[in-house]
C-alpha cells in the first residue's frame, strides 16, 4: 500500500509533507503553467520545477477547481506568485472563459471556493488549442506521474447547464458524457493531438533518467537524460512555439508541439 497525500497548502508545506509520505499531488503546477502562458514569463514555473517534490502526481485539472492557495503567500512568507500576479491570473481566467468561471467561483455559487477558480482548464486558456497542448506538454514532461482528468483529456468546455441545474461551482468541470459525446470528443483535432503527445511521452526511455530545467527569459527547457537516450521539451512562452527533441541509440528526432503536427501522427 502507498500513501498519496492530497492537500492544498503553502508550497513549502507541500515539500515537507512529501518527505514524509510516498507521494503528493503537485497542485502548484496548474496555476504556474497558466501564469507562464498568460504572462509569457516561465520563471516562477522554472523555480518550482527546481525544488518541487519528485515523488508527485502532476495535474492540471481535477474534479475540483484550479487551486490558488498552493502558489500564494502564507502570512509574511512569500509564495511562488505574489498577490498582484495571482489577481492577474484569476482575472485572466475569468476573461478567457467569458465570465463563466466567475459565475462558478466563490459567492456566485453555493460552495464558497475561495481558494480555487472553477473552470475547465481548456476554457481557462480561452479554448486555445496551442496553449492547451503546451500546458499538457509541460505537465507530462515534468517529474512525477502525470494524471489527466477525463474532462481534460477530452478538452471539455464549461458545463453551464449543469452549473445552472445544481448551483455547485465545481460542477462546471464535471460533465456527464455518454458514448456519443466521448466518440465526438475523440474526433476533435486537439484531442487527437493530446493523445499523440501522451503516446510520445510514454515511449521515451529518457524520462526514467535524470531531470533538469533551464530557463532564459521566455524560453523554458525541460531536459531528461539516461544512459542511452535523451529528451528535451522546449517552450517559447512568448510565441507559444514548442517542440520535443529526443535521441535514442544515436538517432535524433524532432516533433513540433502543434495540433496539425501531433494530430497527423495519430494515424501515421
Q: What kind of region is each of these model predictions?
A:
Residues 1-268:
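Active-site and adjacent substrate-binding regions of carbohydrate-active enzymes
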Amino acid at each position: 500500500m502507498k500513501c498519496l497525500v492530497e492537500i492544498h497548502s503553502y508550497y513549502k508545506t507541500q515539500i515537507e509533507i512529501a518527505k514524509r509520505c510516498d507521494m503528493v499531488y503537485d497542485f502548484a503546477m496548474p496555476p504556474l503553467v497558466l501564469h507562464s502562458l498568460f504572462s509569457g514569463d516561465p520563471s516562477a514555473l522554472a523555480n518550482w520545477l527546481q525544488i518541487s517534490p519528485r515523488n508527485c502526481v502532476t495535474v492540471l485539472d481535477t474534479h475540483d477547481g484550479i487551486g490558488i492557495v498552493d502558489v500564494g503567500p502564507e502570512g509574511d512568507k512569500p509564495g511562488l506568485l505574489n498577490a498582484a500576479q495571482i489577481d492577474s491570473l484569476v482575472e485572466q481566467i475569468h476573461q478567457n472563459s467569458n465570465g463563466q468561471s466567475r459565475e462558478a467561483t466563490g459567492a456566485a455559487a453555493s460552495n464558497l471556493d475561495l481558494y480555487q477558480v472553477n473552470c475547465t482548464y481548456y476554457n481557462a486558456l480561452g479554448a486555445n488549442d496551442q496553449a492547451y497542448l503546451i500546458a499538457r506538454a509541460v505537465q507530462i514532461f515534468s517529474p512525477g506521474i502525470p494524471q489527466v482528468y477525463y474532462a481534460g483529456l477530452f478538452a471539455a468546455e464549461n458545463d453551464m447547464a449543469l452549473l445552472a441545474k445544481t448551483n455547485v461551482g465545481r460542477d462546471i468541470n464535471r460533465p456527464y458524457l455518454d458514448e456519443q459525446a466521448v466518440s465526438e470528443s475523440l474526433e476533435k483535432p486537439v484531442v487527437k493531438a493530446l493523445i499523440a503527445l501522451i503516446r510520445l511521452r510514454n515511449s521515451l526511455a529518457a524520462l526514467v533518467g535524470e531531470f533538469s530545467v533551464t530557463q532564459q527569459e521566455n524560453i523554458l527547457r525541460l531536459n531528461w537524460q539516461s544512459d542511452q537516450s535523451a529528451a528535451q521539451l522546449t517552450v517559447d512562452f512568448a510565441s507559444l512555439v514548442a517542440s520535443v527533441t529526443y535521441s535514442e541509440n544515436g538517432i535524433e528526432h524532432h516533433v513540433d508541439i502543434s495540433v496539425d503536427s501531433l494530430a497527423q501522427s495519430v494515424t501515421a
